[in-house]
């Protein structure tokens, strides 16, 4: 996203008009190659790893940032709702859809993105270039063939099925299926949802069915991709009793089936370092 389309959260009021003006300029003079479908994206990092993704539209009717609501597209973290209104001011009246949102698909069999990657030489390349500040290289190809689009949609349907969910997550506390999880940009997607909910109040059911604001731009990546590295977030606790903390963590983990403490099937062991 060009820096002219980015605003600081601290001084967003001062930059809204400039952002909207820059969007108008880009819409008229830069973004002239339309794609009727998806865009297959490859980002080559400095390490040589290639992150593959599909850029498309997320149906906001299938997403909610409110805890407990049934939806097939869900956030991976709690949403701080106070961060939504400033973003709504930028999105309201914007002529371009330019959020940075990464969705994650739990696709160990590589049925969604990788088959498209294997056929990229058949696709029309729509952009390519170097990214700033050592960000690597990026290229995008248009996925417009109806057969390939149907293939993507079918893969998403299977990934979001109840059968697939039950097979992957037999110990999950909530049983409604999950198609995509928000990996990054949760508050941007939440803002799109909030804007859509406000706008939908002014529309007839027929208008709401196909209104452009119902969808939000996002990139979908496979969480099993070798280029997706999920780093731990370390926490330091001061002036606590190590044994008490350990017991509390084990109790919480077992009660929530989090699998983050100890036991034969626990997948995320951790270390408590401190005086014993």
Protein language model annotation of sequence segments:
Residues 184-251:
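Catalytic or ion-translocation cores adjacent to nucleophile or general acid/base/metal-coordination motifs
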Residues 22-181:
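Short alpha-helix boundary/capping and kink motifs at helix termini
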Residues 1-11:
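Single conserved hydrophobic/aromatic residue that forms the stacking wall/gate
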Residues 9, 17, 138-147, 159-167, ...:
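Compositional signal for N-terminal targeting/processing segments
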Residues 85-89, 203-204, 255-259, 266:
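Glycine-rich, charged/polar anion/phosphate-binding loops
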Residues 99, 214-216, 268:
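Residues that flank catalytic or metal-binding motifs in active/ligand-binding sites
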């Amino acid at each position: 996203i060009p820096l002219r389309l980015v605003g600081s959260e601290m001084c967003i009021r001062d930059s809204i008009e400039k952002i909207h003006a820059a969007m108008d300029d880009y819409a008229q003079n830069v973004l002239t190659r339309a794609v009727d479908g998806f865009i297959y994206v490859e980002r080559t990092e400095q390490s040589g790893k290639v992150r593959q993704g599909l850029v498309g539209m997320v149906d906001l009717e299938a997403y909610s940032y409110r805890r407990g609501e049934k939806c097939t597209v869900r956030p991976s973290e709690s949403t701080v709702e106070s961060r939504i209104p400033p973003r709504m001011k930028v999105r309201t009246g914007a002529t371009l859809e330019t959020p940075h949102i990464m969705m994650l698909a739990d696709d160990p069999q590589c049925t969604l993105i990788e088959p498209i990657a294997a056929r990229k030489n058949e696709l029309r390349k729509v952009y390519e270039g170097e990214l700033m500040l050592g960000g690597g290289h990026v290229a995008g190809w248009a996925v417009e063939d109806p057969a390939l689009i149907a293939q993507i949609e079918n893969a998403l349907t299977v990934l979001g099925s109840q059968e697939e969910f039950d097979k992957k997550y037999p110990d999950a506390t909530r049983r409604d299926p999950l198609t995509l999880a928000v990996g990054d940009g949760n508050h941007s997607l939440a803002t799109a949802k909030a804007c859509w909910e406000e706008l939908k109040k002014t529309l007839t059911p027929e208008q709401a069915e196909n209104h452009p604001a119902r969808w939000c731009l996002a990139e979908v990546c496979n969480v099993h991709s070798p280029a997706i590295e999920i780093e731990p977030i370390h926490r330091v606790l001061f002036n606590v009793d190590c044994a008490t903390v350990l017991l509390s963590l084990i109790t919480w983990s077992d009660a929530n089936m989090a699998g983050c403490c100890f036991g034969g099937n626990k997948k995320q062991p951790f270390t408590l370092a401190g005086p014993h």
